[in-house]
Amino acid sequence: VLILVVSDIPYDDYMAGNAPINNLLGVSIVALALPLYEQLRQIAKQWKIILSVVTLASLFSMFTGAIFAIILGASPEMVATVLPKSITTPIAMEVSSHLGGIPAVTAVGVIVAGLQGSVFGYLILKKLGIKQQEAVGLSVGAVSHALGTVSCMEADPKAGSYSSISLVLCGIMSSILAPLVFHVIRLFL
């Protein structure tokens, strides 16, 4: 981000140059489907718990991001921009746009959240003594989407599978809940 700002490179030019790499993201998501398929029976048995956890994680992520933005004095436009930070990039940009945010800035926030989760998420949960790979995967996938899911997959296929389902369900739940959350938050702005 700093390089883009200092070099005065428009975000649209950056995204156009990054298109081949971004296209590979779709391929990597498909590659995550095999471990997910291998865990399908166990995931199907726990669908109510998984959906509850993912819904709460989506709400928590949106509210905490918005609250920090408000504490820092952000405008409603910036609150709408950071609200979808924990959804995968294409969905987050669309949600941001729908709420009146700035999709390009949202994309940067999503990348930062993904990098933080992929680098630190699995390690932090391990240090906290969380041993259930299902919980690790759901947590990391909920807050750091595809990048976090890849780091989970490298550490443990079961965690990666749960992270995959978490990133998909968080995208769905967040896009459904974001307008409601933003409306509630705007009451306090």
Segments and roles (model prediction):
Residues V1-P35, K45-V53, A57:
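Helical membrane-embedded segments and adjacent short helical loop/helix-boundary regions
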Residues P20, L40-G65, A107-Q116, L167-M173:
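Entry/N-cap segments of selected transmembrane alpha helices
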Residues P35-W47, I70-I71, E94-L115, K127, ...:
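Helix-loop-helix hairpins and the membrane-proximal interhelical loops
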Residues S52-A92, A113-I130:
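Transmembrane alpha-helices that form the ion-translocation and gating core
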Residues L177-L189:
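Juxtamembrane boundary at the C-terminal end of a transmembrane helix
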